[in-house]
Amino acid sequence: MKTTIKQAKDHLNQDVTIGAWLTNKRSSGKIAFLQLRDGTGFMQGVVVKSEVDEEVFKLAKEITQESSLYVTGTITEDNRSDLGYEMQVKSIEVISEAHDYPITPKNHGTEFLMDHRHLWLRSKKQHAVMKIRNEVIRATYEFFNKDGFTKVDPPILTASAPEGTSELFHTKYFDQDAFLSQSGQLYLEAAAMAHGKVFSFGPTFRAEKSKTRRHLIEFWMIEGEMAFTNHAESLEIQEQYVTHVVKSVLENCKLELKILERDTSKLEKVATPFPRISYDDAIEFLKSEGFDDIEWGEDFGAPHETAIANHYDLPVFITNYPTKIKPFYMQPNPENEETVLCADLIAPEGYGEIIGGSERVDDLELLEQRVKEHGLDEEAYSYYLDLRRYGSVPHCGFGLGLERTVAWISGVEHVRETAPFPRLLNRLYP
């Protein structure tokens, strides 16, 4: 009977065949231990010399790392294993023998591993990170579908940009200028006027010459836009969404979190409502903590965000930033028009901003004024302005960076490990 490592628990004390790769092996005289993986998980295969043909035991000792195999044997309980079971191997069939696999069990430098990213993905920890990434995506669809959102796919090639063109990748669209999308927001706002609540999930591109552990050139973003929604209601949706995702990972990725040695007690504390602190109060807090490198009207850097988040040890909303450091489309704060109705959600443990969101300007005259103030081409945004001409309503939206969120939940140091094939300032290969 052919099965998988994940399903093998359903076949205790039965003989099964599993297609797998050999990740590592060791032997102690009359017993060989094979570390097997098949994409669904990792399992040990035990080959006892006295219980198999001589050729099988010889093969078990000689087979090379990352060779592909069909392994047949009996599934037995093993309480020492993370899975709780292992295979007593009876026969091995080599599908393809691997030669001189470059990523050996010894330690390798990050650049070497990134050069071999196509192979590094096979390792146990990288496999666990990708499984958590997959669970975040699955839980995202679950949340938005259950809450009545409609998925909309905005274009990747655009003629306009939500936040200006200075950090965009430029290309030619036949005889026109085009840019790789840095956000689907403007298109989602249009879709929200048709469907009420919409979301998207897709790649975004930022031509930022940044080398920090938080930044990728290409990353994936989950964006939501909601008609007839105010700023306070939007924050509630955002915190409910993030809480749902964290709980889903805790429930469905226990083994992966264990492999990554993640301190799950920090994730178990994540619950609504999240703390909120205004930009003004955040500036005062930082001053009280000895930060003298930040003044009102300046954006926060990584050390500032980390200090604020660590104070709460939870995801925290920083609200109502100064108008002059935020994009043109954000609604003024009626209590202080030098600020806007916006919020950044800062993850704890130094992972930084994972969500940026705001209430959108819904008045045509104000939006036209903002477009001019920011030096944007009004013609390029004519469709966006149309949304305010024909039945404008209060509406809000937000965007969550997938890779940063996965890094935080997984506890990995750098976002490069949370994308299958990360695009960094100095890396376009593989």
From Swiss-Prot:
Catalytic activity, EC: 6.1.1.22
Keyword tags: Aminoacyl-tRNA synthetase, ATP-binding, Cytoplasm, Ligase, Nucleotide-binding, Protein biosynthesis
Catalytic function, reaction form: tRNA(Asn) + L-asparagine + ATP = L-asparaginyl-tRNA(Asn) + AMP + diphosphate + H(+)
GO biological process: asparaginyl-tRNA aminoacylation
InterPro entries attached to this UniProt entry: Aa-tRNA-synt_II, aa-tRNA-synth_II, aa-tRNA-synth_II/BPL/LPL, Asn-tRNA-ligase, Asp/Asn-tRNA-synth_IIb, NA-bd_OB-fold, NA-bd_OB_tRNA
Cellular compartment(s): Cytoplasm
Gene3D superfamilies: Bira Bifunctional Protein, Domain 2 (3.30.930.10), Nucleic acid-binding proteins (2.40.50.140)
A single GO cellular-component term on record: cytoplasm
UniProt family annotation: Belongs to the class-II aminoacyl-tRNA synthetase family.
Identification of the protein by name: Asparagine--tRNA ligase
Organism, scientific name: Staphylococcus aureus (strain MW2)
